[in-house]
């Protein structure tokens, strides 16, 4: 009898969850280190304030946050070797992929990315090969429902926003130009909106439409492989398929 099998499965599941959580903590710690180069005081450093907010939302312990700030600002070790690098490539069905990384070794990161692409039906490309298919913009998530839409529209007329999207979870995502993130989230707060998250994102200008389940699975497998790499900060793609296909492919 395999009476221990359930416990073994629980332990394996916990190990996977712990590993993923550790990877998230490491990734967010690196973001804090890079942001802290411009000053260790969050009140005068918007990028650091943003990184700390993301870390707290993910449950990163306060001690980890403090150590990352110290390293990045040169007070506790060397965090200055980390640099922000962008990589571009193609996936199955011509999907464009844009990856942001924080790394202390460009050669290692490029090799890891090249392997992940090649093992999953893609190719790491040259700088600029797909960036023109995306736009970099600000995004602020607020608490809002369909009942708040008229008020939200009035608010956005007074702010430097260029659109919004109401979501089914009781939130709305407000979009704006890349350079306006701080002013946009400050303005929404001042108008009484509860701001949940804010940051920059890459949005696809055109999409690759996927209708085949096998192709969708290949695309998602590549994106998951890239996102799982230690140095990767974000993975963006111009992939589009309907919700039913996404559920089948996941």
UniProtKB/Swiss-Prot annotation:
Keyword Transcription regulation: yes
Segments traversing the membrane: none
Record keywords, A-Z: Cytoplasm, DNA-binding, Transcription, Transcription regulation
SUPFAM superfamilies the UniProt entry points to: YebC-like (SSF75625)
Gene3D superfamilies: 1.10.10.200, 3.30.70.980
GO term, biological process aspect, one: regulation of DNA-templated transcription
One Pfam family named in its UniProt record: Transcrip_reg
GO CC, alphabetical: cytosol
InterPro entries: Integrase-like_N (IPR017856), TACO1_YebC-like_2nd/3rd_dom (IPR048300), TACO1_YebC_N (IPR049083), Transcrip_reg_TACO1-like (IPR002876), Transcrip_reg_TACO1-like_dom3 (IPR026564), YebC-like (IPR029072)
Any one Gene Ontology molecular-function term assigned to this protein's record: DNA binding
Primary localization: cytoplasm
Location(s), subcellular: Cytoplasm
Family note: Belongs to the TACO1 family.
Name the UniProt record assigns to this protein: Probable transcriptional regulatory protein SYNW0543
Organism annotation: Parasynechococcus marenigrum (strain WH8102)
